[in-house]
Amino acid sequence: MTERVQNREVKVCPVVLRKSGSAVELLLFEHPLADVQLVKGTLELTDSSVESAALRELEEESGISKVSRAKYLGSWESGFQNQLWHFVLCEISENLPNNWSFYTQDDGGLKFNFFWHKLGDSPKFKCHKVFSSAIKQVEILCI
């Protein structure tokens, strides 16, 4: 796996869920240049674990740092650019709003607009095929 990490092919995806009545919702965001996405980033050689990388990416892209528990869910060969994704369930120790914006330092500073998507529902937003497939993978792992 070290070669894939060096090639920047190994991705970490912190999965943030919440209950809304009987539904389970997944945290997503609208990227100003690339439609709707899940929080995701690259596993670095300096990361001590997949879980620590997921926590780093979650904070970098959303500002969320109060994670009470990180649980490894599984991996997925995405079929996109030889990317291997690792999903990590991140339980948040605070109530998050329905929508919010976060200014990330990615690409010189971008505003990401966060929202919740009900798992099992058809997406009502535009996203790259790898992200729609990743959402389906989260549904398999979590519901």
Over which residues does each language-model region extend?
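Active-site-adjacent beta-strand/loop module that shapes the phosphate/pyrophosphate-binding cleft
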Residues: 10, 77-103, 112-121, 130-142
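Conserved Nudix-box catalytic region and its N-terminal flanking loop in Nudix hydrolases
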Residues: 22-64
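Short, P/G- and charge-enriched loop/turn segments at secondary-structure junctions
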Residues: 1-4, 101-105
